[in-house]
């Protein structure tokens, strides 16, 4: 109803209908995108994706596997229902990569149902998934005029397919709304299936690289940022707004810190969020060298969050220096699971859950 020109007529007709059948036991259900407030008494029921904690409890899996599953499915019930806990996560991915199974069909079918010409929208979503995130970049990639791109993007935002982020310079970037959409467009839109509907080992490997290096890493970065937000007051006596974008992704010397606050007492946070990576002495020397050029070591607070095994040398650093804080994966989960973090996790509109 949202953008229809005759919505007032629709609501008036609905009210008349309800008045006429007021003596009957009739239930009217309106299904669709988020509804505006209407004058007719009603109850709003919102369908939301599963959180990582709900996945862990429902499927009886570990914290780490629940994050894997959430990052793969975006917590969508239709996709979660196909997950087989008796086999490994990797085997589940291989099974899911088939053109006749829900992981492929859900996105394809919904685009056809939502849009008369899904190809135009597919082009923009594919561009977003591959790094073209500003209107100018999307226009250049697609060949569409900027006003046409803007119109398409606005529609996709309404359908819950695209989210927008404001950069520190005031510009807006657009991204696929959740991890499932991002993975689908990054790896499957242009992939050619085998004759039996499966995908080759090369496609699977590209899928897993994108999953580990981009999707999963981004989720763990959010966990690290959440830990910092909840623990910053125990580290610094100054008030620090951890959500201030000017403190995010700051290059200091040769190191890009995920968070850097350089005032009276500096706080530097580095997030090691790619599985299989590791913290090295070379990295620590670069961190120390970059942050002590203009101020002494003891005036800095260092926070190293990692999803990988913490080397003994880094534990030794944290024991010797009060201003070096090592945050292992177990601690990240302990903080993250203290409360429901739905607000941090992407939502899907009702028609897509």
What are these regions (language model features)?
Residues 3-41:
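Sensor-1/coupling segment of RecA-like P-loop NTPase cores
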Residues 28, 42-46, 247-249, 326:
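Conserved beta-strand scaffold positions in the cores of enzyme catalytic domains, especially
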Residues 30-36, 49, 76, 305-309, ...:
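A short beta-strand-to-loop transition that corresponds to the Sensor-1 phosphate-sensing loop
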Residues 42-69:
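Conserved small helical "lid"/interfacial subdomain of P-loop NTPases
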Residues 54-57, 162, 334-341:
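Short, charged, surface-exposed secondary-structure boundary motifs
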Residues 59-106:
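Amphipathic alpha-helical "lid/sensor" segments that cap RecA-like P-loop NTPase cores
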Residues 95-253:
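Accessory nucleic acid-recognition modules appended to NTPase machines
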Residues 177-353:
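A cross-kingdom feature that marks ATP-driven nucleic-acid transaction machinery
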């Amino acid at each position: 109803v949202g953008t229809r020109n005759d919505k007032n007529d629709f609501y008036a007709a609905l009210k008349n209908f309800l008045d006429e059948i007021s003596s009957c036991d009739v239930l009217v259900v309106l299904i669709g995108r988020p509804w505006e407030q209407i004058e007719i008494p009603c109850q709003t029921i919102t369908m939301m994706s599963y959180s990582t904690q709900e996945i862990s409890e429902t499927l009886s899996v570990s914290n780490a596997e629940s994050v894997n599953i959430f990052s793969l499915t975006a917590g969508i019930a239709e996709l979660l229902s196909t997950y087989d806990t008796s086999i490994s996560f990797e085997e589940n991915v291989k099974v899911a990569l088939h053109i006749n199974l829900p992981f492929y069909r859900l996105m394809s079918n919904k685009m056809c149902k939502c849009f008369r010409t899904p190809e135009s929208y597919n082009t923009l979503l594919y561009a977003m998934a591959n790094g073209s995130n500003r209107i100018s970049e999307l226009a250049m990639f697609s060949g569409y005029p900027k006003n046409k791109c803007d119109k398409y993007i606005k529609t996709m935002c309404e359908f819950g397919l695209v989210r927008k982020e404001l950069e520190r310079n005031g510009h807006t970037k657009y991204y696929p709304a959740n991890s499932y959409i991002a993975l689908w467009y990054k790896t499957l839109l242009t992939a050619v299936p085998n004759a039996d509907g499966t995908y080759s080992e090369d496609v699977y490997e590209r899928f897993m690289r994108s999953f580990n290096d981009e999707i999963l890493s981004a989720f763990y970065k959010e966990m690290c940022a959440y830990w910092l937000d909840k623990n910053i007051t125990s580290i610094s006596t100054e008030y620090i707004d951890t959500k201030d974008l000017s403190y995010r992704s700051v290059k200091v010397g040769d190191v890009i810190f995920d968070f850097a606050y350089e005032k009276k007492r500096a706080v530097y946070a580095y997030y090691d969020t790619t599985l299989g990576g590791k913290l090295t002495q070379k990295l620590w020397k670069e961190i120390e060298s970059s942050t002590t050029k203009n101020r002494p070591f003891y005036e800095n607070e260092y926070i190293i969050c990692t999803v990988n095994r913490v080397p003994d040398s880094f534990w030794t650093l944290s024991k010797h220096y009060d201003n070096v804080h090592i945050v292992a994966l177990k601690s990240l989960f302990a903080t993250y699971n203290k409360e429901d973090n739905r607000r941090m996790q992407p939502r899907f509109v009702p028609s897509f859950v």
